[in-house]
């Protein structure tokens, strides 16, 4: 497992973003805040990212918005993004195929 440092606006010095690279897929934790004023990466939440989404947490809309948002930010197809766990929770484990841990780190740095 590879741990990458994170330097977001809400970064906490006691945590580092934990990114796992296994079998061609990168996975990390995302904390989703639905019904926000805009879609954005806010910063770090424990060992993952905190993402605000405008979509409500109803009828899978927040999950679909998270798929689109991450695919857009990482420039991958929607099929490359998968919620590995936490589909009905605000804290999710996301798996993305076709990206490197370094690319995920770049995403965090430029949020």
Stretches found by the model and what they are:
Residues 2-67, 73-78, 82-111:
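Contiguous, often N-terminal, cationic amphipathic patches that form binding interfaces
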